[in-house]
Amino acid sequence: FLPFIAGVAAKFLPKIFCAISKKC
């Protein structure tokens, strides 16, 4: 369960951070 969440976070967090901070 945790490895799955870590994988999803690793995939989506950079995109969310990029959209929020406007730093890509």
Curated annotation (Swiss-Prot):
Biological processes per GO annotation: defense response to bacterium
Q: Which GO terms describe its cellular component?
A: extracellular region
Key words of the record:
Amphibian defense peptide, Antibiotic, Antimicrobial, Disulfide bond, Secreted
Say yes or no: keyword Secreted present: yes
Q: Give compartment(s).
A: Secreted
Which branch of life, at top level?
Eukaryota
Disulfide bond residue pairs: 18-24
Coarse class of the protein's main subcellular location = secreted
| Expression tissues | Expressed by the skin glands.
Q: What does this protein do?
A: Antibacterial activity against Gram-positive bacterium S.aureus.
Q: What protein family does this chain belong to?
A: Belongs to the frog skin active peptide (FSAP) family. Brevinin subfamily.
Q: What is this protein called?
A: Brevinin-1Bc
Native species of this protein?
A: Lithobates berlandieri
